[in-house]
């Protein structure tokens, strides 16, 4: 009798995706982040569902309802902080996952890579709208500043901003629609993640060596299920530690002040995971130029496959490209630091230099390094 997991229409899909999936035998811990992102997403959908049961999307009661969740709902504070800090974990895993893709040349699976970019943009939009919901000072002013960037679009900009706001300022209509979108988008992300996996399983996983692993595949279960469970336990350990010991470490104190349209906070800044893009935005004095740089800082990922000049897929045996990759990582950390600082003399120029370096590494230096390494290999 054939095993039911290989014949049942539903079980067959799960079996071919998570049990009998032929997987390269040499993939490292850098390949764990895909499953960790799945865990983060499920955790978010569950905690978000329970938060939505108690939250009210109204400007007069939103702030109070979040306080009520933390004070009066059984373990509401755990749910709220798991959701908020879970977002930080989500973005750490995302950056690691994208970084792994860049390092090992996974972007040459173009369909998987492009769906991944769409996923990244959707997750960023979802996180931004979620940050607006508690209706604190930083929620309100963050929403005002970021949505206002659309007014830089010629001709239709102002109309577009007012259409998104649902009025002439960020108000009740804005909050209500942001809540509606914040609720529905994670399910769209879940569907996109399935498409992401579908395209990945068409080609099979990449591996650290960058060469075909068809001659050496092992079943996903039990080898990588065990490995993924270890990753999940470490992720949850980090998240629970953060939630129980310093839940406000990554948040902004301004968000504990109810939103006040007539009082602007001293430094308006987004959550830490958007600071690198915010620094790039601020480093260009022109509004439209800044917005374009902000958008291109993410969309640049889409042209990475076109800029691949090396004969080798990954960077495992390419020391020059490795140096540039880690320089890029350091540059992104610098941008993250600058994004959280006030706009003052030495910091502005550091931000501008870091922004120029970011685009130069990706657009110019890495393709050149690939060509140099191709020629070096002939010696």
Curated annotation (Swiss-Prot):
UniProt topology in membrane: Multi-pass membrane protein
GO cellular component terms listed in the entry, alphabetical order: mitochondrial inner membrane; respiratory chain complex III
Cell compartment(s), UniProt: Mitochondrion inner membrane
ATP-binding found in the keyword field: no
Superkingdom to which the source organism belongs: Eukaryota
Listed GO MF terms: metal ion binding; ubiquinol-cytochrome-c reductase activity
UniProt xrefs under SUPFAM superfamilies: a domain/subunit of cytochrome bc1 complex (Ubiquinol-cytochrome c reductase), Transmembrane di-heme cytochromes
Residues reported to bind a ubiquinone: 201
Disulfide pairings: none
InterPro entries: Cyt_b/b6_C (IPR005798), Cyt_b/b6_C_sf (IPR036150), Cyt_b/b6_N (IPR005797), Cytb/b6-like_sf (IPR027387), Cytochrome_b (IPR030689), Cytochrome_b_C_euk/bac (IPR048260), Cytochrome_b_N_euk/bac (IPR048259), Di-haem_cyt_TM (IPR016174)
Protein's UniProt keywords contain Metal-binding: yes
Essential cofactor(s): heme b
Free-text remark on how the cofactor is bound: Binds 2 heme b groups non-covalently.
Positions annotated to bind heme b b566: 97, 196
Keywords: Electron transport, Heme, Iron, Membrane, Metal-binding, Mitochondrion, Mitochondrion inner membrane, Respiratory chain, Transmembrane, Transmembrane helix, Transport, Ubiquinone
Gene Ontology biological-process annotations: mitochondrial electron transport, ubiquinol to cytochrome c
Role according to the record: Component of the ubiquinol-cytochrome c reductase complex (complex III or cytochrome b-c1 complex) that is part of the mitochondrial respiratory chain. The b-c1 complex mediates electron transfer from ubiquinol to cytochrome c. Contributes to the generation of a proton gradient across the mitochondrial membrane that is then used for ATP synthesis.
Quaternary structure and partners: The cytochrome bc1 complex contains 11 subunits: 3 respiratory subunits (MT-CYB, CYC1 and UQCRFS1), 2 core proteins (UQCRC1 and UQCRC2) and 6 low-molecular weight proteins (UQCRH/QCR6, UQCRB/QCR7, UQCRQ/QCR8, UQCR10/QCR9, UQCR11/QCR10 and a cleavage product of UQCRFS1). This cytochrome bc1 complex then forms a dimer.
Sequence similarity: Belongs to the cytochrome b family.
PANTHER family linked to this entry: CYTOCHROME B (PTHR19271:SF16)
Protein name: Cytochrome b
């Amino acid at each position: 009798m054939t095993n039911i997991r290989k014949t049942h229409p539903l079980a067959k899909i799960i079996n071919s995706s998570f049990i009998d999936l032929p997987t390269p035998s040499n993939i490292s811990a850098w390949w764990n982040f895909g499953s960790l992102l799945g865990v983060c997403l499920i955790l978010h959908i569950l905690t978000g569902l329970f938060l939505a049961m108690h939250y009210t999307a109204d400007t007069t009661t939103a702030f109070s309802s979040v306080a009520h969740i933390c004070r009066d709902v059984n373990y509401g504070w755990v749910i709220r902080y798991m959701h908020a800090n879970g977002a930080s974990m989500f973005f750490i895993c995302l950056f690691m996952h994208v970084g792994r893709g860049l390092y090992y040349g996974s972007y040459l699976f173009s369909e998987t890579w492009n769906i991944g970019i769409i996923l990244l943009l959707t997750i960023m939009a979802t996180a931004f709208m979620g940050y607006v919901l508690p209706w604190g000072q930083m929620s309100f002013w963050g929403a005002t500043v970021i949505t206002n960037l659309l007014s830089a679009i010629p001709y239709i900009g102002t109309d577009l901003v007012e259409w998104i706001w649902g009025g002439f300022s960020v108000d009740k209509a804005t909050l209500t629609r942001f809540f509606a979108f914040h609720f529905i988008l994670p399910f769209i992300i879940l569907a996109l993640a399935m498409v992401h996996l579908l395209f990945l399983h068409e080609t099979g996983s990449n591996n650290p060596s960058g060469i075909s692993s068809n001659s050496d595949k092992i079943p996903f279960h039990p080898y990588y299920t065990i490995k993924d469970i270890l990753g999940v336990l470490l992720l949850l350990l980090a998240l629970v530690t953060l939630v129980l010991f310093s839940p406000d470490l990554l948040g902004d104190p301004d968000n504990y002040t109810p939103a006040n349209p007539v009082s602007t906070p001293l430094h308006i800044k987004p959550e830490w995971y958007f600071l690198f893009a915010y620094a790039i935005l601020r480093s260009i004095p022109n509004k439209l130029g800044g917005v374009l740089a902000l958008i291109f800082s993410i969309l640049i990922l889409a042209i990475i496959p076109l800029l691949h000049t090396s004969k080798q897929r990954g960077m495992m045996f390419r020391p020059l490209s490795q140096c540039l990759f880690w320089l890029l990582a350091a540059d992104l950390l610098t941008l993250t630091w600058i994004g959280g600082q006030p706009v003052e003399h030495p910091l502005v120029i550091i931000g501008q230099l870091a922004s120029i370096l970011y685009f130069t590494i990706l657009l110019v230096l890495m393709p050149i390094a690939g060509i140099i390494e191709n020629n070096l290999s002939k010696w």
